[in-house]
A protein has these predicted regions:
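N-terminal "domain-start" segment that seeds a small globular fold
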Residues: 2-38
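Conserved redox-active cysteine motifs that mediate thiol-disulfide chemistry
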Residues: 50-67, 551-554
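Structural microenvironment flanking redox-active thiols in thiol-disulfide oxidoreductases
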Residues: 59-101, 112-116
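Short, internal strand/loop/helix patches
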Residues: 96-131
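Thiol-/selenol-based redox modules, centered on thioredoxin-like
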Residues: 132-212, 216-221, 518
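Gly/Pro-rich loop segments of beta-rich domains
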Residues: 169-188, 196-204, 209-210, 220, ...
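Residue-level detector of Asp-centered blade-edge/turn motifs that repeat once per structural unit
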Residues: 192-198, 219-223, 264-274, 329-332, ...
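Extracellular/lumen-exposed scaffold segments
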Residues: 244, 514-651
Length: 651
């Protein structure tokens, strides 16, 4: 046993053991109707994953945990605790759909009132809590990148409790639900297929990049219709003009992994690159291209690995990406909604993929709303893109801020503007003046023939309209099942045009009339409901705890490997202490007159594998990046604490 592991175990033993609170909620999913208690889990290593299905970081962690589920089999039980951010996420049917959509193959506790969230003092999505086989909490960690450390910890716990005789093997509580079959399954995005004849050979499930195998449907000539990302089937589908008749399928689980955004390249770019259709291959963290003439699929950007840093650029095939969600063509480049890093990137296409380059176009990777110069702007999971008809800007559906935003060219460079939306924790269905109107987690956007904008207001189940000339927001349609995209289907004249909506949770494309008269809905303004933490006014110490996993240590050879960024909404809450600098502690000065606020904290820490005997970090050691963003509601009280402690990784 490495000395690091022994030290890690000794550290846990030295700390007073805390019995895990019971798992309490509205009910369970993926258990065949059975309830789960901590007593029934005794003898297993348990990992609780506090998540919410809107959260891109939570989806990343789901993917990080899959290999652990497979590796440890009947020794580990993974429990998802779904504690919702948005009102829509508290809906039981919506949660069931999300569990299927994201292939969650473990039990999930439905925690709509945040009962278990509060019992475990969770403060961020995602949060992981590890329980030993005797039912005690042994570790808590927030954010992404913990898979390696979890594996080391689980190995340690298995060895320890095998020796003690307290480890129990055997089947876990997971029961797979029925798997329904539909033509489309949780479709993501739609675009219009080219009306000109293009010979295309449908392709089936492929296992190698740059492949072209047939699904057996034979050759056909495209005559319009639509391309749809059939996300849960991991394919791109060509549908006829009726939106229902299948003409061809491209890809499959061996090629795509939850494809989202689609982009038909302009004629010049098609001729230059030999590719026709680009695909945002979200979980593979790549941009892929389809050649319609023979079904060839190849990677044009990304390495297949998730980007852990929050910047990058250079040769596209050597640059990792992070959950690209949508694509648009603007100023002779491909704009990428990089949802995983809360940024917009640009892809420049050369004559071959080896000549392609990528660069960050807008966003610092901090989550939130900040307008102005693109390099200083903040986004939060941008998920929908549409280029304006005059080419002056790109419309952006910024999902986690429930906002409609745009990127345009200014005298100084690129500029970001918010048209509708208030911030990370404000949402609702409110029409009227744009500065007071509210959306709820929009995923799609398109420009209408009159220059106004249609937004797929996903969690409100609606299509909303923003009119830039009047500054008004109205509602075009309601009662839709998580609309994730919307496009305009033109008629012979503008008056004959209609909308085509991707109803993701209904697994279909739905035509919607484009009427001159729109509804005006005076719904409720809502905020994410989490109990605020009390805090004192004046000087307060912010402390982020980070204990590297056994076998790793912070590497100080080139300076402090940590970074802490702090801000607040409203900004006046912090009289001092805002900003970005190294270190995991910060003295904040809080203005008593403000009363309450959301404290935004972003942290990064890099730990490297150390020598098992000396603990020293070798010159070419493998390093691991740990990062998390918190949005913590705070309220000032007279006897509030003067220390705020957040766990990035506590053991």
């Amino acid at each position: 046993m490495h000395a690091f592991v022994t030290q890690d175990r000794a550290r846990r033993v030295a700390v007073m053991k805390l019995r895990a609170p019971e798992l309490t909620g509205r009910g369970w999913l993926n258990t065949g109707g059975a309830d789960i208690t901590l007593t029934s889990l005794r003898g297993k290593v348990v990992v609780l994953d506090f998540w919410t299905f809107c959260c891109i970081n939570c989806l990343h962690v789901l993917d990080e945990l899959r290999p652990l589920e497979e590796k440890y089999g009947d020794q580990l039980v993974l429990i998802g605790v779904h504690s919702p951010k948005f009102e829509h996420e508290a809906d039981r049917d919506a949660l069931e759909a999300a569990v299927e959509r994201y292939a969650v193959h473990h039990p999930v506790l439905d925690d709509p009132d945040l009962t278990t969230w509060q019992a475990y003092a969770a403060r961020a999505w995602p949060t992981l809590v590890v329980l030993d086989p005797e039912g005690y909490i042994v570790a808590s960690m927030s954010g992404e990148g913990h898979a390696h450390g979890l594996s080391v910890l689980i190995d340690d716990l298995i060895a320890e409790h095998t020796t003690k005789g307290t480890l129990r093997r055997g089947d876990g509580p997971y029961v797979a639900p029925p798997a329904p079959e539909t033509l489309l399954r949780f479709p993501g995005k739609v675009i219009t297929a080219p009306a000109r004849p293009v010979q295309a050979q449908p392709t089936g499930r492929q296992s190698a990049d740059d492949a072209a195998s047939s699904a057996g449907a034979g050759e056909h000539l495209t005559s319009g219709g639509f391309f749809v990302s059939d996300t849960a089937h991991h394919q791109v589908v060509h549908l006829a003009e009726d939106g229902e008749t299948e003409l061809a399928r491209y890809g499959g689980p061996g090629v795509f992994n939850e494809p989202q955004g689609l982009l038909l390249l302009p004629e010049e770019a098609r001729a230059r690159t030999g590719d026709d259709l680009l695909v945002a291959d979200s979980v593979n963290h790549e941009i892929k291209a389809i050649r319609l003439s023979d079904g060839r699929i190849r990677t044009v950007a990304g390495t297949g690995e998730q980007l852990r840093e929050r910047d990058g650029g250079g040769p596209a095939l050597r640059q990792a990406l992070s959950t690209p969600w949508d694509l648009a063509w603007w100023h002779d480049r491909v704009i990428i909604a990089m949802a995983g890093t809360h940024q917009l990137w640009a892809l420049h296409l050369g004559e071959s993929p080896e000549l392609n380059t990528v660069a960050v176009l807008a966003g610092t990777s901090n989550e939130g709303i900040r307008d102005g110069a693109a390099h200083d702007a903040w986004f939060a999971q941008p998920s929908g893109l549409a280029t304006s008809a005059d080419g002056s800007h790109v419309w952006v559906a910024d999902s986690e801020t429930s906002a409609l935003r745009s990127l345009s060219v200014s005298d100084e460079g690129f500029e970001v503007t918010t048209h509708v939306g208030q911030g990370l924790f404000d949402f609702g269905h409110v029409d009227g003046a744009a500065d007071a109107a509210l959306l709820q987690h929009p995923l799609g956007v398109t420009e209408l023939p009159d220059g106004s904008v249609a937004v797929a207001d996903t969690y409100n189940g609606a299509i909303r309209r923003f009119d830039p000339s009047s500054g008004e927001v109205t509602t075009l349609a309601t009662g839709l099942a998580e609309p994730s995209d919307v496009i305009v289907v033109p008629g012979e004249v503008d008056a004959d045009a209609h909308l085509l909506v991707v109803e993701s949770n209904a697994h279909r494309l739905t035509p919607v009339a484009l009427t001159a008269e729109a509804q005006r809905i005076e719904g409720d303004a809502q905020q994410t409901q989490r109990p605020p933490s009390e805090i004192a006014s004046g000087a307060v110490e912010l402390v982020v705890t980070f204990t590297p996993p056994a076998g790793q240590k912070l590497d100080h050879r080139y300076g402090d490997p940590t970074m802490l960024q702090v801000s607040s909404s409203p900004e006046a809450f912090l009289r001092d202490g805002a900003g970005k600098q190294q270190g995991l502690t910060r003295t904040l000065t809080i203005d008593e007159s403000v009363g309450s606020a959301i404290l935004h904290v972003s942290v990064r820490a890099a730990a490297c594998d150390g020598d098992p005997d000396t603990g020293e970090v070798p010159e070419h050691a493998a390093c691991h990046l740990y990062q998390q963003d918190w949005g913590i509601p705070l309220v000032i009280t007279g006897d509030g604490p003067r220390t705020l402690t957040l766990d990035l990784r506590g053991v």
